[in-house]
């Protein structure tokens, strides 16, 4: 419980700090969401400059801690000075107004997190094993001798001749500093605090977007009603296989919104395009300082995850096209034409990527048949007819241009090459589809506000009840009774199987007792609460002095260490021995242990007892249903 209390207190402090930082930039006390987002962008850009340099030069992790603490102190002093110098203050009336206009934002985060807890299978398999990298990185960075050339899931050195793009992302390093300083359990920190923080970022982004659009509407929504636009995010939290099976929405890695929102990549994938265009939706003229904002924002998005690059480039060009059509600024039009010529020429010169095109066309062909996507198109078309609003049209043109740049042959070749990987290009498509659905839902609210003459209460309540009901119903066919799922999560209150936590801590204890690093073979998968659980990729969460050799099958291994030739076939030898002990499997397993310096074995049963002396291992400890053996004289 202490971990959750500290996390909630830290969440409140973080929101207050970032809002205050944004307030010093805007001088507008009432624009809570805008201040919070701008405060985050300002803060994270400043922090990331130093953290990325530390990573590129592979300096000790302690420099990251010193950098974060120093910058937070400097920014705190800046906030105080700015408040005094500019006579800024938040009165009791201002505070009440902020709460009144944003209380649903917190409630929406609560709903999203409740839905997250229902994604039981994804949590148990650690988000398709990806948590084995990201969560373990946050947990172990402070304790690693080589923090930026380590495979965080295996614990082995990750030596590569090529450039590691992960060094451009400061997100996990930044998170590791606060987790270390606060002493919060790493799993709770990632799956609770970071989840609710990123959900809150998304909610505030939608609120800011809606507020900016609302400024140019003839029939404006009251400030207290704008916050309800964020309920659209509940759609993305539907169980991902249900979304795909029903044809409601097909996008790359849709499961990440409902179960891995805490990932750094979730920020550009969900919010990237909106952060780039929202400040300029209502602009009549673009100035040089606006390019400065876009540059800083782009840097922040890349610092969260390098998948942001195609989102930034496609989104930026698309907005320039939309602005050139809806505004009268000659120099921007010329600049846009030059960029488009460059993109088209590059597309003709660069070779096509048929596989990359096929991936996104497959998703899009499914979405064009979905009720959700077709409904979004209809709502958008109706809004064009009803409102005849130049600034709404600008956003529509921006989104349409994004899809054109992604799908039109030859033109899209430049962006396909820019993405490097298929999944990166597909995630950019996810961002644009999410943005379109968010935009159309806001227009849906605007249309009913116009038709009902500012009497939105019924449609808001109806929409919220419908979305909440559907989000729960989407889970039931996959995971069963929600109450049973909540009971399981309550029994495993650290959001990871208790047995895995106990095993990880015990392995670290053994490593400390024997004063050595453990090279451990464990089952890749285990059954916990009658569900599959990916064990091997997570045992390092509490054990920085343990190397999980069984995780090599998922995360690979590079040259330069004793396990460079180890493959998933070798893990198969271990698995075969676990399944049946006969002359063939015993000899193969003995040969494997002689070939590699594996000094610790974990089995789900005591069948190794009769072979341990022959193999040169001693029984060390039983943890839940796991039996730990350590090599003699190791």
Where are the regions a protein language model picked out?
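Membrane-interface transmembrane helices that cradle and orient dolichyl/undecaprenyl
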Residues: 268-292
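Extracytoplasmic
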Residues: 478-634
């Amino acid at each position: 419980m202490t971990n959750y209390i500290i996390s909630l207190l830290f969440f409140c402090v973080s929101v207050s700090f970032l809002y205050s930082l944004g307030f010093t930039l805007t001088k507008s006390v009432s624009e809570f969401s805008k201040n919070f987002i701008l405060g985050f962008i300002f803060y994270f850009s400043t922090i990331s400059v130093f953290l990325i340099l530390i990573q590129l030069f592979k300096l000790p992790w302690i420099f990251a801690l010193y950098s974060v603490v120093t910058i937070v102190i400097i920014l705190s002093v800046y906030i105080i000075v700015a408040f005094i110098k500019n006579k800024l203050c938040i009165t009791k009336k201002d505070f009440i107004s902020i709460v009144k206009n944003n209380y649903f934002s917190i409630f929406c985060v609560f709903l999203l997190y409740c839905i997250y807890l229902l994604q039981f299978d994804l949590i148990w398999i650690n988000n398709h094993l990806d948590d084995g990298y990201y969560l373990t990185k946050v947990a172990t960075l402070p304790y690693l001798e080589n923090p930026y050339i380590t495979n965080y899931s295996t614990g082995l050195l990750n030596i590569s001749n090529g450039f590691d793009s992960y060094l451009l992302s400061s997100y996990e390093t930044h998170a590791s500093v606060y987790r270390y300083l606060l002493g919060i359990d790493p799993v709770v920190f990632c799956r609770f605090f970071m989840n609710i923080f990123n959900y809150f970022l998304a909610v505030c982004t939608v609120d800011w977007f809606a507020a900016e659009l609302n400024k140019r509407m003839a029939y404006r929504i009251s400030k207290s009603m704008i916050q309800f636009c964020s309920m659209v995010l509940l759609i993305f939290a539907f169980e991902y296989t249900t979304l795909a099976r029903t044809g409601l929405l097909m996008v790359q890695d849709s499961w990440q919104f409902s179960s891995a929102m805490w990932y750094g990549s979730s920020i550009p994938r969900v919010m990237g395009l909106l952060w780039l265009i929202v400040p300029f939706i209502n602009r009549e003229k673009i100035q040089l300082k606006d390019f400065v904002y876009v540059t800083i924002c782009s840097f922040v998005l890349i610092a969260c995850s390098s998948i942001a690059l195609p989102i930034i480039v496609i989104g930026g060009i698309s907005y320039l096209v939309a602005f050139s059509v809806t505004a009268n600024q000659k120099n921007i039009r010329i600049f846009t034409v030059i960029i488009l010529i460059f993109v088209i020429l590059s597309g003709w010169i660069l070779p096509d990527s048929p596989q990359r095109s096929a991936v996104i066309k497959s998703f899009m062909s499914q979405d064009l048949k979905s009720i959700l996507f077709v409904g979004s198109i209809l709502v958008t078309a109706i809004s064009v007819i009803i409102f005849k609003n130049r600034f709404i049209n600008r956003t529509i043109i921006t989104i349409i241009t994004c899809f054109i740049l992604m799908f039109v042959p030859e033109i899209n070749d430049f962006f396909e090459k820019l993405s490097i990987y298929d999944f990166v290009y597909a995630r950019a498509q996810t961002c644009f589809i999410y943005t379109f659905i968010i935009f159309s839902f806001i227009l849906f609210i605007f249309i009913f506000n116009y038709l009902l003459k500012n009497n939105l209460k019924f449609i808001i309540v109806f929409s919220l009840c419908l979305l909440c009901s559907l989000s729960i119903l989407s889970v039931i066919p996959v995971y069963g009774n929600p109450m049973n799922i909540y009971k399981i999560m309550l029994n495993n209150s650290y959001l990871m199987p208790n047995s895995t936590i106990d095993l990880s801590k015990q392995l670290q204890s053994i490593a400390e007792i024997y004063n050595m690093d453990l090279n451990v073979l464990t089952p890749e998968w285990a059954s916990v609460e009658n569900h599959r659980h990916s064990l091997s990729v997570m045992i390092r969460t509490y054990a920085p002095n343990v190397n999980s050799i069984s995780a090599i099958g998922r995360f690979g291994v590079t040259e330069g260490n004793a396990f460079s030739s180890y493959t998933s076939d070798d893990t198969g030898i271990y698995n075969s021995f676990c399944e049946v002990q006969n002359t063939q499997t015993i000899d193969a397993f003995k040969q494997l242990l002689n070939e590699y310096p594996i000094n610790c074995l974990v089995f789900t049963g005591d069948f190794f007892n009769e072979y341990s002396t022959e193999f040169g291992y001693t029984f060390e400890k039983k943890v839940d249903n796991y039996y730990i053996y350590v090599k003699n004289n190791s």
